Regions:
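Acidic catalytic loop of the alpha/beta-hydrolase fold
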Residues: 263-267
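Conserved hydrolase catalytic core segment
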Residues: 120-163
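Active-site loop/oxyanion-hole signature of alpha/beta-hydrolase fold enzymes
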Residues: 86-129
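Short beta-strand/loop motif that positions the catalytic acidic residue
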Residues: 252, 258-260
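Conserved HGGG/HGGXW glycine-rich cap/lid loop of the alpha/beta-hydrolase fold
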Residues: 38-94, 99
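Flexible "cap/lid" loop of the alpha/beta hydrolase fold
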Residues: 148-186
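Catalytic active-site module of serine/aspartate enzymes centered on a nucleophile-bearing elbow/loop
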Residues: 282-311
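Alpha/beta-hydrolase
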Residues: 176-247, 254
């Protein structure tokens, strides 16, 4: 009898230790920085703010989430924001095989994180290629998306080359963009993170309606690790399969807000209009006097739209 009681006590202790070693839901979403390993990738994420959960989806080609964490901080007064670095970028680790740097891989990463965080469904905000990841997620996992905010987003398999070229041509005689266009049209094959960072800084004026005022404000938010040239080359590999999004937008069930700067050349208004036509429960807002980063150039209008939608 004593042996049985002792065995039961030992088992109880072991179970208690095992349970204590697994983060509980409230710990996983406690304010602060966290790491978790899922499917062979160690993800960094940060939780900040108060209110309903809003997951911030960063791009997946080598930049981290720092520019969003700093730039979108005013939303923390209204929402609990979860920021995370995508696989291979910033503080998250590389996948074992560089072939697994596709948008589809990142969509599945987000689903693993949703389950890990214990969220029944999410409101997602994706910027730029982060918007393409959010689109892919809402297509593949429509039941788990409560609301979708797409900010200057692209579509993974949409050919926007003509739209982009038209936007560049409209700026070619503007001295504010002369050096950026020259860099954009030159040979580009960075070998180091430093070279990649230098290139991005040279072309960055093109991403603003008014670079003279926009660039210094953006620089204050872009304080994270250097962009990863490894992630860029792995993501941009010519044989990398594209996720089929363009013909599947009608699978998205969530209410969707689409925001785009009228002066955005990389994710132009024409592409945003294409997204609106494909998602039945969507609304498009074109923001005047803004390029690719509307929270920098038209912050009051941008935050008002997001708060009104996501609340």
């Amino acid at each position: 009898m004593k042996k049985a009681a002792l065995a039961l006590l030992v088992l109880t202790v072991k179970l208690s230790v095992a349970q204590a070693s697994v983060p509980q839901p409230d710990e996983k979403l406690a304010a602060g920085e966290h790491y978790t390993e899922l499917a062979g990738v160690k993800f960094w994420y940060k939780v900040a703010g108060r209110g309903p959960v809003l997951v911030i989806q960063a791009p997946g080609w080598g930049v981290g989430s720092e520019y969003l964490r700093n730039g979108l901080a005013p939303l923390e007064q209204h929402f609990t924001l979860i920021y995370y670095d995508t696989r291979g970028s910033a503080r998250s680790s590389r996948p074992p095989d560089e072939k697994h740097m596709t948008t589809a891989d990142m969509v599945d990463d987000l689903e693993r994180l949703r389950r890990f965080w214990g969220l029944d469904s999410m409101t997602l905000l994706g910027h730029s290629h982060g918007g393409a990841i959010a689109l892919g997620y809402a297509i593949r996992y429509p039941k788990f998306v409560h609301g979708l905010v797409l900010v200057d987003s692209n579509i993974e398999d949409y050919d926007d080359g003509a739209d982009r070229n038209r936007e560049i041509a409209a700026r070619k005689n503007d001295p504010r963009f002369k050096d950026a266009i020259a860099s954009m049209t030159s040979d580009f094959d960075p070998k180091t993170d430093e070279q990649f960072d230098s290139f991005l800084k040279r072309v960055l004026p093109l991403y603003f309606y008014e670079p003279v005022s926009g660039l210094p404000r953006f620089a204050k938010t872009d304080t994270g690790p250097l962009p990863s040239v490894w992630a860029y080359h792995a993501f941009a590999a010519p044989d990398k399969p594209l996720m089929k999004e363009d013909g599947s937008l009608d699978r998205i069930e969530a209410q969707t807000l689409i925001l785009v700067g009228r002066a955005d050349w990389i994710c132009p208004v024409a592409e945003a209009e294409h997204i609106r036509k494909g998602i039945r429960n969507s609304r498009l807002v074109v923001l005047d006097k803004s390029g690719h980063f509307p929270w920098i150039e038209v912050s009051e209008r941008f935050f008002a739209e997001v708060i009104r939608f996501a609340k």
